[in-house]
A protein has these predicted regions:
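Serine-dependent protease modules
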Residues: 1-204
Length: 204
């Protein structure tokens, strides 16, 4: 399939996620404020189950899911696991378009990858492409050591929880990190083209 074909095929399966979290402010006046966050998710059943990253929804009071056609739903967290950074959400909807689940164990370095997500929390259904740059890459994400797929598809904040698809349009990974590591002197090394995804076999 062409990248255009894959994009048309998979975009209805990817959702934008917006979260609201009450954050206490430790001031003399007490009080709290609402901190909003954004991420992405992938529909895995036609009746509203959605997989995303645990760090996207962790601590959220309100979670809103927006489908590719703009319809919005309130989502509930069915389960989440911070170690694998996977969470499952549920929305009350039917007739959705679930992603076709691929096999991340059969991936080869150099294969085409297509990432679909909501970068910066405002650019929903953005499609970027690249290749599988490495497999079983040991990466530490928020204190957890993980074995991830490395891809050159452009990944930005807000892409987390979105889908990484292969050239057949099958879901092979859940995007969860990009390189933002610091050197031992504390300088940020924002390398481009270093994105990471949880292998779908691990996530499932």
């Amino acid at each position: 399939l062409s990248i255009q074909d894959v994009a048309a095929l998979v975009q209805p399966s990817v959702v934008a996620i917006t979260t609201e979290q009450m954050v206490s402010t430790n001031t003399w006046f007490g009080g709290s404020y609402v901190q909003s966050g954004a991420g992405s998710g992938v529909i895995i059943s036609q009746d509203g189950y959605i997989v995303t990253c645990a760090h996207v929804v962790s601590g959220a009071n309100n979670i809103t899911v927006q489908l590719a056609d703009g319809t919005e739903y309130t989502a509930t967290v069915v389960g989440q696991d911070s170690t694998s950074d996977v969470a499952v959400l549920k929305i009350e909807a039917t007739g959705l378009t679930p992603a076709v689940i691929g096999d991340s164990d059969s991936l080869a370095v150099g294969e085409t990858t297509i990432a679909v997500g909501n970068p910066l929390g405002t650019l929903s259904n953005t499609v970027t492409n690249g290749i599988v740059s490495a497999l079983n890459r040991e990466v530490t994400v928020q204190g957890n050591d993980m074995n991830l797929i490395q891809t050159s598809a452009s990944i930005s904040p807000g892409n987390s929880g979105g889908g990484l698809f292969n050239g057949q349009g099958e879901l092979i990974g859940i995007v969860n990190a990009k390189s933002g590591s610091t050197t031992n002197t504390g300088e940020a090394t924002n390398a481009e083209g270093l994105g990471f995804a949880i292998p779908i076999n691990t996530a499932m």
